[in-house]
Amino acid sequence: MDPIPLAVMADWWNSIQKGATEAAETTRLVSLRTKLQAEVMYVESQIKGALQKFGVEVFPHMENNNSAQVQQHFVDVKREVDGYREQIAAKNVEIAELNTQIENVGKDAAVAAN
């Protein structure tokens, strides 16, 4: 049996190193994406809580036909919910960027740019 040429062994070793590096990078990116997805879920729960609180606080005013209080509560909660929705939109942009990076792990820079 002939010995394996050094060039073949070097190529094999480089391939293993490249694969390990790509796996580590993919793991890093996926963990960042998972963190952002958890943050989105948390903010969505904040929205749900704000809407539930709104219902509890507004119901008595609606029973008493106090439209000014109802309107004020609505304005306050809408502002809060809009802020949460902006946070979610920003996190979703980051998630989309991470998805693109994950898809491009291991691709040549020229191929990834296309």
Give the role of each language-model region.
Residues 25-46, 82:
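Short, charge/polar-rich alpha-helical segments
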Residues 87, 91-114:
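Long amphipathic alpha-helical coiled-coil segments
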Residues 51-78:
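Short E/K-rich amphipathic alpha-helical oligomerization segments
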Residues 27, 61-65, 102:
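Secondary-structure edge/capping motif, primarily at the C-terminal ends of alpha-helices
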Residues 8-32, 67:
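Short, charge-rich amphipathic alpha-helices with coiled-coil/heptad character
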Residues 40-57, 93:
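Amphipathic, heptad-repeat alpha-helices with coiled-coil/zipper character that mediate oligomerization
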Residues 14, 41, 45-48, 75-89:
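Generic structural signal for well-ordered, non-transmembrane alpha-helical segments
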Residues 33-36, 77, 91, 95-98:
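Long, non-membrane, amphipathic alpha-helices that form coiled-coils
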